[in-house]
């Protein structure tokens, strides 16, 4: 019998393929996104030192994990990054399609001043 892989397994494989090409540096750290059913988590990571420079999630902001919450999260993480002097990042969509909540987060981060 042929076993169908779950969508999360295929997303994880897609994310590994993306991570081969998306690398954060001290000049342009990586903006990583993880999306669950209940929350969205964002980290800005320097991959050379393996340090998380800043992070945010929808649970801390007390907003939902919907498109409006993703936009608020994008704005919040961009403000945190600008306080640290980070203006340019590399966007890592985490294997998710660039659509819906992921797109709303990215658009809000760009509007708040991050460049990617």
Curated annotation (Swiss-Prot):
<dbReference type="InterPro" id="IPR004389">
    <property type="entry name" value="Ribosomal_uL18_bac-type"/>
</dbReference>
<dbReference type="GO" id="GO:1990904">
    <property type="term" value="C:ribonucleoprotein complex"/>
</dbReference>
<keyword id="KW-0694">RNA-binding</keyword>
<dbReference type="GO" id="GO:0006412">
    <property type="term" value="P:translation"/>
</dbReference>
<comment type="function">
    <text>This is one of the proteins that bind and probably mediate the attachment of the 5S RNA into the large ribosomal subunit, where it forms part of the central protuberance.</text>
</comment>
<keyword id="KW-0699">rRNA-binding</keyword>
<comment type="subunit">
    <text>Part of the 50S ribosomal subunit; part of the 5S rRNA/L5/L18/L25 subcomplex. Contacts the 5S and 23S rRNAs.</text>
</comment>
<dbReference type="GO" id="GO:0005737">
    <property type="term" value="C:cytoplasm"/>
</dbReference>
<dbReference type="GO" id="GO:0008097">
    <property type="term" value="F:5S rRNA binding"/>
</dbReference>
<protein>
    <recommendedName>
        <fullName>Large ribosomal subunit protein uL18</fullName>
    </recommendedName>
</protein>
<comment type="similarity">
    <text>Belongs to the universal ribosomal protein uL18 family.</text>
</comment>
<keyword id="KW-0689">Ribosomal protein</keyword>
<keyword id="KW-0687">Ribonucleoprotein</keyword>
<dbReference type="GO" id="GO:0005840">
    <property type="term" value="C:ribosome"/>
</dbReference>
<dbReference type="GO" id="GO:0003735">
    <property type="term" value="F:structural constituent of ribosome"/>
</dbReference>
<dbReference type="InterPro" id="IPR005484">
    <property type="entry name" value="Ribosomal_uL18_bac/euk"/>
</dbReference>
<dbReference type="Pfam" id="PF00861">
    <property type="entry name" value="Ribosomal_L18p"/>
</dbReference>
